[in-house]
Amino acid sequence: MLAYYVRLALKSFRRTPGITALMIGAIALGISACIVTLTVYHAMAGNPIWWKNDVLYAVTLDSRDPPQPGASDVNGPPDQLSYADATYLYGSSIPRRKAIMITATGALSGAPGHSGAVLVHFRATSAGFFRMFDVPFEYGGPWNAAADQGPEPVIVLSRQENDKLFGGTDSVGRSILFDNHPFRIVGVLDQWNPQPTFYDMSQRSFGNASEAYVPFAWDAQLHIWPAGHMSCWGDADPHTYPQLIGANCVWILLWAELPDAASREHFQAYMDAYWAQQHKMGRFQRPRDNRLWPVDRWLTRHHVVTDNSKLLLRLAFAFLAVCLINTVGIELTKFLRAAPLTGVRRALGASRGHIFLQHLVETALIALIGSAIGLALSWAELDAIQALYAGSKDAYGLLAHFDPLGVLWALALAALATLIAGLYPAWRIGRVPPALHLKSQ
């Protein structure tokens, strides 16, 4: 019977091609809008390292001056730490791994076939960064902990930077000039650009990963001025690197890998003891607010999913609902126009259930075709967004890629909604008395 109902549906399509195309087009537009919006929203709202959510913690202290009378501070401690606080906490042996970091700009030169210097955004960090955040390598690997102490002149390149400087070949072991100092390449990253950039959201929640990585201690050796966010208070106004490391300024990020509750409690106590010591010395005059942020709470703190994104998602589903309502109206009109044929089938012995199933199969075919076209449209729209924002750091260009799980959910939801919306027209045509249309024949 199913094959018979499919043949009847195809005949119906040929009888009313314009109306059928209109219904399919409405469904396709609604589904494509939902898929594109839900894909971007799902990427924004996702935790890019969910499997380590209860292991990785952002470390914050509040070393700022007391707030002015009457002022309120609902945001909690700043994301970053001062040089003294960050280096002290980094020296703890409690975490399994730890990562201290800043971002800055530097120049790479000396690569074969490149006469001039290439300006890069690099990250001065520690060896733990790569293993903590599961950073993949195409060639080589990270430097070891001993290289952090020296520091040794070692560097890790991103895949894109290695492609640019060495044509994508294995450059491990080669030398390159970093700010006119010879550095040895120890590793080249594979494709890695998690969104949101959970490990560093001091400036923005979405963006491109760093192009090169060097041991954090080179920051002090070369007096590298940070390019990331910096916040100072009091009379702090540093103009040189020695002034910066002693100033009341926060500009360094610190993460700790704490695998169990015992290590978390131990490190929290370590932070609290440090706070008490500094408080006695005249620092940390605000109420104690030492925090360890798991990744999911860190993302929530930074409002990664904005109210505008939520509103856009609601509008996309509202648009789909409007498309479906219009489709129901058009479909009901189409079925009622074919009521004389339905009356003949009823007179020949077809039951109301058979009529209902016949029109439900037709609705399902329309939903299937509309969903397929909507999927193709959404693919084209996501490609267009990527092309539009190619080369920019805009979040939409980075997030507009096909996420199979998000697309599957959106497609299944839209197709199911279309099928449910078609229940009423199919039921309504089955309730039409056949005698009325037989008399008109």
What role is predicted for each listed range?
Residues 1-6, 11, 15, 19, ...:
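Membrane-helix entry/capping segments
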Residues 6-18, 325-361, 365-366, 431-440:
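Intracellular coupling helices
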Residues 128-142, 153-302:
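Mid-to-C-terminal secondary-structure elements
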Residues 15-50:
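Short, strongly hydrophobic transmembrane alpha-helices
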Residues 406-441:
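C-terminal membrane-exit region of the final transmembrane helix in multipass inner-membrane proteins
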Residues 37-110, 116, 248-253:
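Membrane-proximal extracellular/periplasmic loop immediately following the first transmembrane helix
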Residues 325, 341-386, 409, 413-417, ...:
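Transmembrane alpha-helical interface segments in multi-pass membrane proteins
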Residues 62-79, 99-128, 142-155, 177, ...:
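Short acidic/polar micro-motifs at solvent-exposed secondary-structure junctions
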